[in-house]
Regions:
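Conserved alpha/beta-hydrolase "nucleophile elbow" surrounding the catalytic nucleophile
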Residues: 37-39, 124-129, 176
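Serine-hydrolase catalytic machinery in alpha/beta-hydrolase-like enzymes
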Residues: 2-121
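C-terminal catalytic histidine-bearing segment of alpha/beta-hydrolase fold enzymes
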Residues: 184-241
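Primarily recognizes the serine-hydrolase "nucleophile elbow" in alpha/beta-hydrolase
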Residues: 122-167
Length: 241
């Protein structure tokens, strides 16, 4: 069992993050959910998400990507570099994740959550959107330990991933029915790097965040399976059908 909740002073001062403790009705310290925003966003939106989820026995940590976007574009990014697609003019999601891996794997998980607070790897989960999901996938793929899981909305396996063996961490991937990055090739690549990949295809177009109960249902089912509980899930806290 973890010895205590993490505090802001446990983390390097270079990291910008917020910590949302478990609901008062669930005082046990059991799980950590690390929330990673998408390209060009900040941690604020996922801080609100953590509060809205209100998962029992779960502390939510919303992290801000380490590097601001250039040219007064606003927001932050998880990549090692900034590149633009010459055909579309859009920013490339996949520009290397060595910096993000170091932050997530070493500074956050190993040094703070495991080393200082006594959490087990199995008690730590990721929820990532877009480029944030790719950062989570890259970090988990580089680890020998099994984490609680990754929920990836529109996140791919980074091209830079060179893992020699499939990671143990279970992965839930969600994407739209059209205009999506989650193609058959993307799933095949993920299945080559992770032992357990579950794919849910939404009926809507695009890889946006879930907007209703139907779109949230596979996520809540994944939480129900993978979040640890020392006294059971309180009625109504996690809707599974």
């Amino acid at each position: 069992m973890p010895t205590r909740l993490p505090t802001l002073t446990d983390f390097p001062t270079s990291l910008h993050l917020t910590i949302t403790p478990p609901p008062p009705s669930s005082p046990q310290l059991t799980n950590i959910l690390i929330l990673l925003h998408g390209l060009g966003d900040t941690s604020a939106s996922f801080t609100n998400l953590g509060k809205q989820l209100s998962l029992p026995e779960t502390t939510c940590i919303s992290m801000q990507a380490p590097t601001p976007l250039p040219f007064e574009l606003g927001g932050f990014h998880w990549g090692d570099d900034i590149q633009f697609d010459q055909a579309t003019g859009n920013m490339d999601f996949d520009t290397g994740f060595s910096k993000a891996i170091k932050i997530l794997k070493q500074e956050v998980i190993e040094d703070c959550l495991v080393g200082k607070c006594g959490y087990k790897h199995r008690e730590i989960m990721f929820f990532g959107f877009g480029q944030g999901a790719m950062a989570a996938i890259a970090a988990a793929a580089s680890m020998n330990e099994e984490l609680g899981g990754i929920i990836s909305i529109g996140g791919l396996l980074p091209a830079s991933d060179t893992s020699a063996k499939a990671a143990k961490t279970p992965l839930l991937v969600l994407g739209g029915s059209s205009n999506t990055l989650i193609t058959k090739t993307a799933i095949t690549n993920l299945e080559a790097s992770f032992q357990n990949v579950e794919y849910h295809r939404w009926s809507k177009a695009g890889d946006g965040m879930p907007q209703n109960r139907e779109e949230m249902l596979p996520i809540m089912r994944f939480f129900a399976r993978r979040l640890k509980s020392r006294k059971g899930v309180p009625g109504g806290s996690v809707e599974i059908g």
